[in-house]
């Protein structure tokens, strides 16, 4: 059967039709977007300009911050523009591009979080072999695998959606183009496609989440034999990552591990992994991390001293 696509334009319904609420949301999301850029750039500069870049934990954190910036930038700018626009429209081509990029960078983020959990597992459960196992070559390989996994995931979502005909209503009950809200507009039987989407998005999120949980079960089992001081240090290192994982995975699992259907709450849950998690990640990873705080002080104190020397 040939694809018959009469929809060349989609209308994004967003959060509200009330103009006052939209202006308030614009100010809020503008603040969030600026905070995301400032926080994640601060993390990246502090890591790359110090010796922390040579430690696997911070090597992955650097790439997590980069993926956060890319991921939120596929959604937030368009969302802010729509909040001030009279008609919240997006062309079919741009919708497909947004679908691909959000799942590409979202997939990368999921796999990097899994890689970071593996790094913590090796550091705590196999400390004597840590430097050998987590070599720079191994870290680079993990990042390449994360990017490849993200591409395969997003390409699958893209291919499953691009051949679906859209010839009926063109209103997407969301603030960006995602698979489930789009499939709701399809004018053909999408039962099999829905199962494939669940197998792709749902299972990836579920399997990686289970792997993350298992890694921390092994970590908790291992640190039982540690002294109180070592146990406290190990838990402090892992707690930041656990908070980020829950913040990102819990809403993603709620949305993607169910049959093809949408709820009005999906838009709120999607905010957690598209805007809230990228905004809080820098704060979560630096709040209880002495090394990260010291690196920031070192970088920015050097910058202040350089500026003073230039003035005098």
Swiss-Prot record:
Cellular location(s): Cell membrane
Side of membrane Cytoplasmic, spans: 48-55, 119-137, 218-233, 288-312
Domain of life: Eukaryota
Membrane topology: Multi-pass membrane protein
Transmembrane segments: 24-47, 56-77, 99-118, 138-156, 194-217, 234-256, 268-287
Principal localisation: membrane
Glycosites: 5-6
InterPro entries reported for this sequence: GPCR_Rhodpsn, GPCR_Rhodpsn_7TM, Olfact_rcpt, Olfactory_Receptors
PROSITE patterns documented for this protein: G_PROTEIN_RECEP_F1_1, G_PROTEIN_RECEP_F1_2
One Pfam entry name: 7tm_4
Regions of this protein lying in the Extracellular compartment: 1-23, 78-98, 157-193, 257-267
Keyword Membrane applies: yes
GO molecular function: G protein-coupled receptor activity; olfactory receptor activity
Disulphide connectivity of cysteines: 95-187
GO CC aspect terms: plasma membrane
Keywords: Cell membrane, Disulfide bond, G-protein coupled receptor, Glycoprotein, Membrane, Olfaction, Receptor, Sensory transduction, Transducer, Transmembrane, Transmembrane helix
Classification via PANTHER family: OLFACTORY RECEPTOR (PTHR48002)
Role according to the record: Odorant receptor.
Family to which this protein belongs: Belongs to the G-protein coupled receptor 1 family.
Protein name listed in UniProt: Olfactory receptor 4P4
Taxon lineage: Eukaryota, Metazoa, Chordata, Craniata, Vertebrata
